[in-house]
Curated annotation (Swiss-Prot):
Protein name per its UniProtKB record: Phosphoglycerate kinase
Gene Ontology biological process terms, A to Z: gluconeogenesis; glycolytic process
Entries under PANTHER family matching the protein: PHOSPHOGLYCERATE KINASE, PHOSPHOGLYCERATE KINASE 1, CHLOROPLASTIC-RELATED
Coiled-coil residue windows: none
SUPFAM superfamilies: Phosphoglycerate kinase
Binding site for ATP: 206, 294, 325, 352-355
UniProt main location, coarse: cytoplasm
């Protein structure tokens, strides 16, 4: 179903409510990574160019008690956004009431306002997170049209996305549009061959994704901690490696269903301890010593995965290949990241989270077609689930 995008709306002289994802990491009141703010700029700038009034709002962290408010204000975000836009961003330190309403009424065309953390509404009965209908209706009453550009929360039905959209004409912002196009494209209509690379620690986190992608992808390459549950399902010794014992039968079923579509590592980098200081070495996947644990894929697996990627037209990657925060066990993730980045004739997509962080740390971000801004949202999209934040946007 085609959704309206911001370019479909008449924005001149309009009060434009914009749900952005400014859930940025902070330390001592300072923003440590402003990627999410930068990602929202095209939508905000377009609204201002069209002489709309931009009324922005976002959540920041979890807020359950008054004490939780400490360090969760969006004030530093307003200051950073103002620097990035090169113009004043009016900050309103509340989520409802006369102060906010007056500030919106006084807003002129081409001006920007950011109001306080939407999750401050969660202190009294989780009104934001539980999509309180009165709150959604109230926020909707503050604007003429609604633009949802927060893909990172699209898998949640909150008052600030679904609640407003059910009361007001709405459209996707440019970032949301891009996410629907690329992440949705993997599920709906990928250029083939489609190769999925899935990593991370737990099978339980990725079951839905593996099941769905086995029906869509030409190959599914599996790395990371969840590998060992699959190896155990094949009757291999995995030593002290991470094992989800209650998921072995399920892994067995997935292996049977997948046939040669599912590709597992052929070697592992092992150590006796989960530490960067402990000695480590590489062994073949079927001979992990009883007193050691696998913490990364080895070079033979990097080579195998690189070979499987050749000729792919669409690649989607979600989850690291090993404990990449420890440098001794980061080579698998780096190797896979490089292999995908070097593909010249493919649409390459990273499904957010740790993989996105890895690509950025390695300086490969610009080598990928699309890096998703939503970890949980992109995973649920890849599972084939309908995302409430997307479904609630007006159809064209």
């Amino acid at each position: 179903m085609a959704k309206k995008v911001v370019t479909d709306l008449d924005l001149k002289d309009k009060k434009v409510l914009v749900r952005v994802d400014f859930n940025v990491p902070m330390k001592d009141g300072k923003i440590t990574n402003d990627n999410r703010i930068v990602a929202a700029l095209p939508t905000i700038e377009y609204i201002l160019e069209q002489n709309g009034k931009a009324i922005l709002f976002s959540h920041l962290g979890k807020v359950k008690t008054e004490e939780d408010k400490e360090g969760k204000s969006l004030r530093p975000v307003a200051a950073r956004l103002s620097e990035l836009l090169g113009k004043e961003v009016k900050f309103v330190p509340t989520t409802r009431g006369p102060e906010l309403e007056k500030a919106i009424d006084e807003l002129k065309d081409g001006e920007v306002l950011l109001f306080e953390n939407t999750r401050f509404e969660d202190i009294d009965g989780k009104k934001e997170s539980k999509n309180d209908p009165e709150l959604g209706k109230y926020w909707a009453s503050l604007g003429d049209v609604f633009v949802n550009d927060a893909f990172g929360t699209a898998h949640r039905a909150h008052a600030s996305n679904v609640g407003i959209a059910s009361n007001l004409e709405s459209a996707a912002g440019f970032l949301m549009e891009k996410e629907i196009k690329f992440i949705g494209g993997v599920v709906d209509n990928p250029a083939r061959p489609l190769v999925a690379i899935l990593g991370g620690a737990k099978v339980s986190d990725k079951i839905g994704v593996i099941e769905n992608l086995l029906t869509k992808a030409d190959k599914v390459l599996v790395g990371g901690g969840m590998t060992f549950t699959f190896m155990a399902a094949q009757g291999q010794e995995i030593g002290k490696s991470l094992l989800e014992a209650d998921k072995v039968e399920l892994a067995k079923g997935l292996l049977e269903k997948a046939g040669d579509k599912l590709v597992l590592p052929v070697d592992a980098v092992v150590s006796k301890e989960f530490s960067n200081d402990a000695p480590f070495h590489t062994v073949s996947a079927d001979s992990i010593p009883a007193d050691e644990m696998g913490l990364d894929i080895g070079q033979a697996t990097i080579d195998l995965f690189t070979k499987e990627l050749q000729g792919a037209k669409t690649v989607v990657w979600n989850g690291p290949m090993g404990v990449f925060e420890l440098s001794n066990f980061a080579k698998g993730t780096i190797g896979v990241c490089e292999a995908i980045a070097n593909l010249t004739d493919a649409t390459t997509i990273i499904g957010g989270g740790d993989s996105a962080a890895a690509a950025m740390d390695l300086g490969f971000a610009d080598k990928f077609t699309h890096i998703s801004t939503g970890g949980g949202a992109s995973l649920e999209y890849l599972e084939g689930k309908e995302l409430p934040g997307v479904a609630s946007i007006s159809d064209k």
